């Protein structure tokens, strides 16, 4: 007989609990303020890019901006542009599909397994078979929501699956690959920029709990605005698992000066966690990233690579291509510890050159 936690009714209660937490998070005032900062960030970067080439810009509503230069025009909405086709977005949010496409082109990807909440045993069998830490995540979507790392057993799988299911019924579990996350940004197969993205961390003051340290960090982010971070640190299963691996909980009071890593999922990180990496990534990895973009068939994409050594090929280092993202975030390219890569400044001339020219009015 399974322990109580393994019973379907209890699993459903866990899922409902996570749904309530997410509903509360969405309605919080600080969440709305963070979203407003994100909107401001994109509005300002497109206006700056337009001004640098003498283009005009007109808000059309719903955060859509129309940018004109001579007879050419293009439209953008935050990090969505005119070259981001609906079908491309639909494909790239489907992580198992992207994994299959990359595997067909013999690119390095992590072993994975698709499942639903009714197939927990299937996911547990996969975790047992790989005999190492795994990652549970929604099979569709992005932004790091519902992703839990460090999953090692049945109880972990159940909790992580309940958390992931808040964001979609189709789930996946994959082998967790050791190493750092590198975001490679491509346009038509050419590398634009590469960023080493470290996970969020806080430095203990010797008197505050980890929960309080997270609160203080989020307060700093809200006061500083989008120049520091475009998201708040969400306390989720990944935070709890990452702390547990360090022998900590949210109630722990670490010694002064100790750096506490908060998450392995890097989507909530800040400017202080991003480092320029174009000079670190070897030619082989850059070529693999371009091949991944071509395999999926997209034009502007952010490719996430995990590797312990970016200076050698992925197959040698044991690294993988994790995801191919359309409508990639620009924030970590603009805001790094050691400089900035203004994506919109480089991208806008391309968008205008590849736009449809304004039609001339017909003469009756």
Task: Pin down the residues of each PLM region.
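ATP-binding N-terminal substructure of ATP-dependent carboxylate-amine bond-forming enzymes
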Residues: 1-93, 97-100, 118-121
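Hydrophobic faces of well-ordered beta-strands that scaffold small-molecule active sites
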Residues: 136, 171, 301-303, 322
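Short glycine-/small-residue-rich flexible loop motifs, especially phosphate/cofactor-binding loops
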Residues: 47, 99, 124, 240, ...
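C-terminal active-site "lid" helix and adjoining low-complexity regulatory extension at the edge
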Residues: 270-283, 294-300, 307-364
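Active-site "cap" helix and flanking loop/linker of ATP-utilizing ligase/carboxylase catalytic domains
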Residues: 207-246, 250, 340-364
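Short aromatic/hydrophobic-glycine micro-motifs
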Residues: 54-56, 107, 132, 169, ...
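Active-site nucleotide/adenylate-binding loops and adjacent lid/helix of ATP-dependent enzymes
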Residues: 68, 74-78, 83-235, 282-287
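A long amphipathic alpha-helix within ATP-dependent nucleotide-binding catalytic cores
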Residues: 163, 167, 217-311
């Amino acid at each position: 007989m399974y322990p109580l936690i393994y019973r379907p009714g209890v699993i459903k209660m866990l899922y409902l609990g996570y749904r309530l937490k997410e509903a509360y998070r969405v309605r919080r005032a600080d969440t709305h303020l963070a979203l407003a900062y994100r909107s401001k960030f994109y509005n300002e970067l497109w206006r700056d890019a337009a001004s640098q080439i003498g283009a005009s810009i007109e808000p059309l509503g719903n955060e859509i901006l129309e940018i004109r230069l001579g007879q050419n025009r293009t439209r953008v909405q935050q990090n969505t542009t005119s070259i981001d086709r609906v079908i491309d977005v639909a494909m790239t949010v489907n992580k198992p599909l992207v994994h299959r496409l990359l595997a067909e082109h013999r690119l390095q990807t992590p072993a994975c397994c698709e499942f639903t909440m009714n197939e927990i045993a299937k996911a547990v069998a996969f975790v047992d078979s790989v005999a190492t830490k795994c990652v549970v995540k929604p099979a569709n979507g992005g932004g790091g929501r519902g992703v839990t790392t460090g999953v090692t057993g049945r109880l972990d799988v159940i909790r992580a699956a309940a958390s992931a299911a808040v964001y979609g019924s189709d789930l996946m579990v994959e082998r967790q690959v050791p190493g750092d996350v590198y975001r490679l940004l491509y346009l038509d197969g050419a590398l634009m920029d590469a960023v080493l993205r470290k996970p969020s961390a806080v430095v203990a003051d010797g008197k505050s709990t980890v929960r309080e340290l997270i609160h203080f960090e989020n307060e700093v982010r809200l006061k500083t605005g989008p120049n520091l971070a475009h998201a708040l640190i969400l306390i989720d299963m990944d935070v709890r698992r990452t702390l547990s691996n360090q022998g900590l909980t949210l109630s722990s009071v670490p010694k002064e000066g100790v750096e506490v890593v908060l998450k392995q999922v890097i989507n909530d990180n800040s400017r202080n966690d991003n480092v320029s990496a174009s000079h670190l990534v070897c030619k082989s990895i850059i070529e693999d990233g371009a091949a991944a973009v071509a395999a999926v068939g997209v034009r502007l994409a952010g490719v996430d690579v995990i590797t312990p050594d970016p200076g050698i090929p992925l197959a040698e280092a044991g690294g993988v291509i994790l995801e191919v993202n359309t409508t990639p975030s620009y924030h970590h390219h603009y805001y790094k510890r050691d400089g900035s890569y203004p994506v919109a400044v480089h991208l806008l001339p391309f968008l205008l050159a590849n736009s449809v020219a304004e039609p001339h009015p017909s003469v009756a």
